[in-house]
């Protein structure tokens, strides 16, 4: 067995209690011919000092924009949301996060708005985000996460899950990983390796060297272990 448990500790801070009702925004995922919900994903704002420090740590020009892009792509690929072009945004990210001008977001037909900011606190990545109901002019949810900088991609997936669940009522699936058997080499001598990746295809890693045949990998739902079939001295074994 291979332990794939990630020791990621998030400090989840509820800034404001989410309103109990869904307001005017509802995404019905049970009916056919669904019109995706127009959503504006504003780039997460970041102060100059934090931007510079994270650029050195992560080799990213703007980690706030990178996290926002992950959220945008996740929502789009779900088929339930239509992220609007940032070229149409009328309000700067830092101002929108403090107090959105809902008339501006209504003007570009956004029904939901996601804002937030990124800061460096003692070399930790702190990400705050807010979900707004543009039609009702209300905040729906506000959360914050603190983690090590290298977990910035996962923060984007977790935000996506929170937004998805808040707007659809169904649990999100973006912060998940896929275990699979990768094949390479010529047709007459294929090499199979156990591999794992994020659900969006990022962070692909090989878990075995390809010295032995591997088949049928499965996640254990209780302890986050991976079980797979392999052959040792031509005998099948479960690992």
Residue positions per predicted region:
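Amphipathic beta-strand/beta-sheet edge segments enriched in Tyr/Trp
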Residues: 25-26, 95-162
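Beta-propeller blade-edge and WD-like acidic-aromatic loop motif
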Residues: 188-205, 225, 229-239
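Residue position within the beta-strands of beta-propeller blades
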Residues: 115, 178-183, 225-229
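Short beta-strand->alpha-helix linker/helix-N-cap micro-motif
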Residues: 28-101, 114-117
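Conserved beta-propeller blade repeats
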Residues: 152, 166, 211-229
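N-terminal signal peptide c-region/cleavage motif recognized by signal peptidases
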Residues: 16-18
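Residue-level detector of Asp-centered blade-edge/turn motifs that repeat once per structural unit
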Residues: 170-174, 221-222
């Amino acid at each position: 067995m291979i332990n794939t448990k990630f020791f990621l500790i998030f400090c989840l801070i509820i800034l404001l209690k989410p309103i109990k009702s869904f307001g005017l925004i509802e995404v019905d995922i049970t009916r056919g011919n669904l019109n995706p919900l127009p959503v504006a994903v504003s780039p997460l704002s970041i102060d100059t000092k934090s931007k510079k420090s994270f650029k050195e740590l992560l080799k990213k020009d703007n980690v706030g924009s990178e996290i926002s892009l992950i959220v945008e792509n996740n929502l789009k690929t779900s088929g339930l949301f239509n992220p609007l072009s940032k070229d149409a945004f009328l309000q700067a990210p830092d101002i929108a996060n403090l107090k959105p001008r809902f008339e501006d977001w209504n003007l570009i037909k956004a029904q939901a708005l996601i804002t937030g900011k990124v800061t460096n606190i003692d070399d930790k990545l702190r990400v705050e985000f807010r979900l707004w109901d543009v039609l009702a002019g209300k905040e729906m949810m506000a959360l914050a996460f603190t983690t090590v900088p290298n977990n910035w991609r996962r923060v984007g997936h977790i935000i996506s899950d929170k937004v998805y669940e808040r707007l659809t009522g169904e649990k999100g699936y973006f912060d998940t990983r896929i275990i699979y058997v990768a094949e390479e080499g010529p047709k007459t001598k294929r090499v199979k390796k156990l591999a794992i990746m994020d659900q969006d295809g990022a962070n692909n890693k090989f878990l075995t060297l390809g010295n032995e045949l591997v088949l049928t990998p499965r996640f254990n739902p209780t302890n986050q272990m991976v079980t797979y079939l392999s052959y040792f001295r031509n005998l099948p074994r479960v690992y």
